Amino acid sequence: MSSTSQKHRDFVAEPMGEKSVQCLAGIGDTLGRRLEEKGFDKAYVVLGQFLVLKKDEELFKEWLKDACSANAKQSRDCYGCLKEWCDAFL
């Protein structure tokens, strides 16, 4: 099993509230700006897309690649972060 980043652990440790999209694991400044330009400015907006896609890993990773040019690691990290958050809080 792969280890998670500190950013991932910090995100899943508490409710997301109004956290920026850049607080998500796998999403840094560049990807965050690209998502913000498409209206995905908050982590909860990306969570909404994650839920619309029924938490499907492949669909979400494909969407993230299309939305902001995320690479495989970035999309995997973001998916894992949202999945673990959902497991803890939904």
UniProtKB/Swiss-Prot annotation:
Keywords: Chromosome, Cytoplasm, DNA-binding, Nucleus. It is found in: Nucleus; Chromosome; Nucleus envelope; Cytoplasm. One of its GO terms (cellular component) is chromatin. The keyword Cytoplasm applies. Belongs to the BAF family. Homodimer. Interacts with nemp1a and nemp1b. Signal peptide: none annotated. It holds the Pfam family SAM_BAF. Non-specific DNA-binding protein that plays key roles in mitotic nuclear reassembly, chromatin organization, DNA damage response, gene expression and intrinsic immunity against foreign DNA. Contains two non-specific double-stranded DNA (dsDNA)-binding sites which promote DNA cross-bridging. Plays a key role in nuclear membrane reformation at the end of mitosis by driving formation of a single nucleus in a spindle-independent manner. One of its GO terms (molecular function) is DNA binding. This is Barrier-to-autointegration factor B. GO terms for biological process: chromosome organization; negative regulation of protein ADP-ribosylation; response to oxidative stress. Has a helix-hairpin-helix (HhH) structural motif conserved among proteins that bind non-specifically to DNA.
